[in-house]
């Protein structure tokens, strides 16, 4: 029979020995596919994966403004175009509706633009209101008022411009006030309205009387995006009046084009006539109506 000390020693050895782990039951792999499946990654050459993006394709840059082939396009004589446009404007006040010509040019995008003034045989605008930038309290200010300027001066005129008050649709600047105009910093307000005086447009002058005489009855035009637009008549104009205005306008544009450098090609591609509320009618350089029953005199009466 074992003694008491031997029993205690054997118990001590059992308490100090490493406990054995319970054996995990064996689980079939098909019951745990996420554990059993091995995760394998492969390198890829696809640039779209991993957040990479393809570089956008560069758009083709064209040197010339877009043009269209007029072969087969329906075009109208002046009287036919007036006939259809007058029908669209039935019920509109004759004095509020204008005929407008759009001259499409074949021209480079980065080339010089056509910009000038022309005096039409039959004026379209009769509400020319001119303001003059000139020294305050000077004889020039008095001269401008006597010539019919709606406003004249320097700081008073600049303050009206900054406040958005534009009681004029033409603006001149005398050469003595050219420095004051630059310091006033009003170009951002006048430029978008086409009112900023400049030597190129002959609106900076030292002869107010001659400039007033030239501006009254003259209309300005400017090429924008390869097109020159200008009002050439009121709805009450006769076909002959409208034809003469268009003839003078086109002759002036061709003269301006002829003055440009030969290295900057520019030519008239299409002429379109429209009205305030009407569509654009491509003209074919003919005058008479195609309908024998219609005469130009029939388009002279008030609608």
Swiss-Prot record:
GO terms for molecular function: structural constituent of ribosome. Component of the mitochondrial ribosome (mitoribosome), a dedicated translation machinery responsible for the synthesis of mitochondrial genome-encoded proteins, including at least some of the essential transmembrane subunits of the mitochondrial respiratory chain. The mitoribosomes are attached to the mitochondrial inner membrane and translation products are cotranslationally integrated into the membrane. It comes from the Eukaryota. Component of the mitochondrial large ribosomal subunit (mt-LSU). Mature N.crassa 74S mitochondrial ribosomes consist of a small (37S) and a large (54S) subunit. The 37S small subunit contains a 16S ribosomal RNA (16S mt-rRNA) and 32 different proteins. The 54S large subunit contains a 23S rRNA (23S mt-rRNA) and 42 different proteins. InterPro entries: Ribosomal_uL1-like (IPR023674), Ribosomal_uL1/biogenesis (IPR028364), Ribosomal_uL1_3-a/b-sand (IPR016095). Pfam families: Ribosomal_L1. SUPFAM superfamilies: Ribosomal protein L1 (SSF56808). The gene is mrpl1. Belongs to the universal ribosomal protein uL1 family. GO terms for cellular component: mitochondrial large ribosomal subunit. This is Large ribosomal subunit protein uL1m. PANTHER family: 54S RIBOSOMAL PROTEIN L1, MITOCHONDRIAL, LARGE RIBOSOMAL SUBUNIT PROTEIN UL1M. It is found in: Mitochondrion. Keywords: Mitochondrion, Ribonucleoprotein, Ribosomal protein, Transit peptide.
């Amino acid at each position: 029979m074992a003694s008491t000390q031997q029993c205690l020693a054997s118990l001590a050895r059992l308490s100090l020995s490493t406990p054995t782990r319970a054996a995990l039951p064996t689980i079939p792999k098909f019951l745990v596919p996420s554990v059993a499946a091995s995760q394998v990654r492969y390198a890829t050459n696809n640039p779209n994966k991993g957040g990479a993006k393809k570089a956008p394709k560069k758009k083709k840059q064209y040197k010339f403004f877009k043009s269209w082939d007029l072969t087969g396009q329906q075009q109208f004589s002046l009287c036919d175009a007036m006939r259809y446009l007058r029908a669209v404007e039935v019920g509109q006040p004759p004095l509020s509706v204008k005929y407008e010509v759009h001259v499409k040019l074949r021209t480079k995008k980065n080339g010089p633009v056509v910009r000038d003034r022309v005096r039409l045989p039959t004026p379209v605008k009769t509400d020319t209101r001119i303001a003059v930038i000139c020294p305050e309290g000077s004889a020039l200010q008095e001269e401008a008022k006597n010539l019919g300027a709606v406003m004249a001066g320097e700081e008073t005129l600049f303050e009206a411009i900054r406040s958005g008050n534009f009681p004029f649709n033409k603006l001149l600047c005398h050469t003595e006030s050219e420095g004051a105009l630059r310091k006033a910093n009003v170009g951002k307000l006048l430029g978008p309205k086409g009112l900023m005086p400049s030597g190129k447009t002959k609106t900076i002058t030292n002869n107010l009387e001659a400039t007033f005489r030239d501006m009254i009855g003259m209309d300005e035009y400017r090429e924008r995006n390869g097109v020159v637009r200008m009002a050439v008549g009121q709805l009450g104009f006769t076909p002959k009046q409208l034809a003469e205005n268009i003839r003078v306008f086109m002759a002036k544009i061709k003269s301006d084009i002829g003055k440009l450098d030969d290295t900057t090609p520019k030519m008239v591609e299409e002429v379109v006539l429209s009205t305030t509320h009407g569509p654009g009618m491509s003209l074919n350089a003919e005058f008479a109506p195609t309908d024998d029953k219609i005469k130009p005199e029939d388009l002279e009466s008030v609608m």
